[in-house]
Amino acid sequence: MKQVLTELQEKDLQHVWHPCSQMKDYEAFPPIVIKKGEGVWLYDEQNQRYLDAVSSWWVNLFGHANPRISQALSEQAFTLEHTIFANFSHEPAIKLAQKLVALTPQSLQKVFFADNGSSAIEVALKMSFQYHMQTGKTQKKRFLALTDAYHGETLGALSVGGVDLYNEVYQPLLLDTVRAQGPDCFRCPFKHHPDSCHAQCISFVEDQLRMHHKEITAVIIEPLIQAAAGMKMYPAIYLRRLRELCTQYDVHLIADEIAVGFGRTGTLFACEQANISPDFMCLSKGLTGGYLPLSVVMTTNDVYQAFYDDYATMKAFLHSHSYTGNTLACRVALEVLAIFEEEQYIDVVQDKGERMRKLALEAFSDLPFVGEYRQVGFVGAIELVANRDTKEPLPSEERIGYQIYKRALAKGLLIRPLGNVLYFMPPYIITDDEMQFMIQTTKDTIVQFFEEREG
C-alpha cells in the first residue's frame, strides 16, 4: 500500500537529493520531515516524536534547541555573523583557538579552521605532504591508512578511507595509499581479548612502515573507534604503539577525532587515554554541539615553522574556505566548551556511560543474534550475527540493520544502523528514563524482527 505523503514530503522528493541514501527507497519509506527538536527528541509534522539515539549523525551533545547555546548564537548574530578570515580575525575565533590549545595535548599549539570533517582531513593531508616537501623529504608522497577506516567523502579523504561502500566506485581517482590491516577485536586474528592484549595487530602497520617509511608522509587513524566501519573498538595500547612507530620511522601521525572528540570516549579527547600527542588532530562534529558546521586542524610549532618564511619563498599554506573561522560557529563552540567546563560534563558522560553499559549488557547479552555488545565511553554498539559461536555475519543483501531501523522509528526511536551493527551515541543530556526507553525499544525491535524473519 502506497504511503500518503504530506505536502512537504512531496516537495522534498521532487527536489532534494539526500546523503547516503538510495533515493528509490524513499518511494516506499519517504523522509520524515522534522518540525522541531527539544532535548533528545525530534518531532515530525504529526508531532510524533523520535528519540535521537545517534545525535543526528554524532554531532549533538547537549540536546536540540539547547537554550544556552541558542542564546549565545542569537546574541552573536546581532553583532557579527561572519568576516573574511585572511588578513582579518575576530574575538570568537581567537578565544576558541586559545581554548583548544589549552585543552588538547601540549604539543598542539596551532589551529587552522575549516568547515567540516572531510575538509579538516584534506587540510591535514595537505599540510603533512607540504611539510615534507619543504623540509627536504621530497620522496614522501604517500599516506598509510587502515583497512575499514573512514575519514570522509571528499577525494582526498576517500583516498585514506577503507570502507568499500564509499570508496569502490571512485577508486580510479584516488591517491596511491599504503594499506595496513586495522584492529578487529571482535574477530581478532590472534584470538586475544582487548582487555588483556598487547596490540599484536600493530605488527601489520609496522610491516608496512618498515617497507615504505621513506615514501610515507603520515599515518592517519580514528582513535579508539573506527566508527563508520561498524563502531569497531580497540584498546589504547594500540595508539601508544602506533605513536612510537611513527616517531621511529619519521612519519606524521594524524588523529581523526572528528567523531570521537569532545567526550564521546569518556575523556575529552580519545588520545588522552593513550597519553599520546599526534602531529595533527582533526576536530569537528561535537565542536559546535550540533548547531553549525565547523572543523579545526591542530598541529605543532614544528609543522608551522616549515611554512613560516618570506612571501617570495612560496612556502605559505594556500588553502581556504569561504566560511573559514565563521564567527557564529566559533561563538557556539566557545559556549559548548564552557558547558563542558562549568557543568563538569566529562564526569557526567562517564557516569551515564556506565549506566548505559549495565542496561545494554542486561538487555542484549543473551539474544541469539547478538554477537557482541561493546562500548567505549558513551558509544555503544550491537553487532548482529548469523551465528554467535562462529561470529558468521548476517547476509548484507537482507539489509537487516535497515529493517530494524525502520521498525524502531515506528516505535519512536532513531537508531540509524551501520550495516548490521546498531549503535547508541545519544546526546549527553539523556535521562535515565530516556536511556531505558532507548535500550528496551531496541531490544524489543530486534526480538520482533527475528521472530518475523524466522516465521
From Swiss-Prot:
One of its GO terms (molecular function) is adenosylmethionine-8-amino-7-oxononanoate transaminase activity. Pathway: Cofactor biosynthesis; biotin biosynthesis; 7,8-diaminononanoate from 8-amino-7-oxononanoate (SAM route): step 1/1. Its EC number is 2.6.1.62. One of its GO terms (biological process) is biotin biosynthetic process. Keywords: Aminotransferase, Biotin biosynthesis, Cytoplasm, Pyridoxal phosphate, S-adenosyl-L-methionine, Transferase. Its main location: cytoplasm. The record marks 20 as: Participates in the substrate recognition with KAPA and in a stacking interaction with the adenine ring of SAM. This is Adenosylmethionine-8-amino-7-oxononanoate aminotransferase. The lineage of its organism: Bacteria, Bacillati, Bacillota, Bacilli, Bacillales.
